[in-house]
């Protein structure tokens, strides 16, 4: 399945909640803040019927997949990997998704959206332990240090992002503004995703 190229606002309307796919722009100009935006996409929106258990499981899986910008195949592969790990498959899945390099760049505040974070990584503008990594799915581990090459640290856009950075960096990450470097200090817990996800519903979806 190819990557979705349509309006990301439609995806939020489909899930009936903000997924913050456009970063900070979602807060100020979100379709969900308007009456029409609260309906599902389409001329008349979705009919108001009680969702089946399967539909609830599907919607939660789709919400998570869209939040991390993954194709169906990519998301399914993450779940298969999570199942093989020790512990809860749901918790393992969220851990794998959160430790993606593009997601960590976003969570550190080095990009205004996950899409921007993916582009920054794809263009080779991120170093992990002083080595250039241009693979968004690269899985980070405890102790990894994420930063920009020296020539990019003076970039106007990067400086503005650092200036606007708020104290919302999750506890499993740390950031040194003087060095413009972030560090993975621990593994993320299930409740530390950028947006609430009920991983148990996803497990039940794949268990069918």
From Swiss-Prot:
Coiled coil: none
Domain S4 RNA-binding: 99-161
Top-rank lineage group of the source organism: Bacteria
Keyword set, alphabetical order: Ribonucleoprotein, Ribosomal protein, RNA-binding, rRNA-binding
GO annotation, biological process: ribosomal small subunit biogenesis; translation
Disordered: annotated segments: 32-53
GO MF, one annotated term: structural constituent of ribosome
Annotated GO CC locations: small ribosomal subunit
UniProt keyword annotation of Cytoplasm present: no
PROSITE patterns given in the database record: RIBOSOMAL_S4, S4
Protein function: One of the primary rRNA binding proteins, it binds directly to 16S rRNA where it nucleates assembly of the body of the 30S subunit.
Similarity-based family: Belongs to the universal ribosomal protein uS4 family.
Assembly notes: Part of the 30S ribosomal subunit. Contacts protein S5. The interaction surface between S4 and S5 is involved in control of translational fidelity.
Protein name, UniProt field: Small ribosomal subunit protein uS4
Organism: Endomicrobium trichonymphae
Lineage, opening ranks: Bacteria, Pseudomonadati, Elusimicrobiota, Endomicrobiia, Endomicrobiales
